[in-house]
């Protein structure tokens, strides 16, 4: 998945509107949190057996909220100058140690409870 054209489009969108001045870590994390809450709202009070229909009926709204989350996350990554692939690789390696396959496979327990 090459996200370069998408990231460039996000960057241009903000530059054209001179919004970079508002994109500081505090406000970006707040915006990110709000967008995640809006995504959560799509599933609020739904029972497990209702989720398939909920997703089907609200797919466009769910996709829009996920897009908002991704856009703010990518802004934050850019502002903080984070090498996202490297950060993800580092975090996965850390999680491999916390959640060894032999203890965590098929298990939803937190690493402290394994």
Describe the residue ranges of each PLM region:
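Flexible "arm" and connector segments at domain edges
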Residues: 1-66, 70-114
């Amino acid at each position: 998945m090459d996200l370069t054209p998408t990231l460039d489009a996000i960057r241009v969108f903000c530059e054209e509107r001179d919004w970079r001045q508002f994109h500081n870590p505090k406000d970006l994390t707040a915006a990110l949190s709000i967008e995640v809450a809006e995504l959560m709202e799509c599933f609020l009070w739904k029972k497990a057996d209702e989720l398939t229909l909920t997703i089907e009926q609200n797919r466009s709204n769910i996709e829009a909220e996920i897009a908002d989350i991704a856009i703010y996350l990518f802004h934050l990554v850019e502002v903080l100058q984070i090498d996202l692939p490297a950060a993800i690789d580092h975090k996965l390696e850390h999680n491999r140690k916390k959640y060894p396959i032999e203890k965590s496979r098929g298990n939803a327990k937190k690493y402290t409870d394994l």
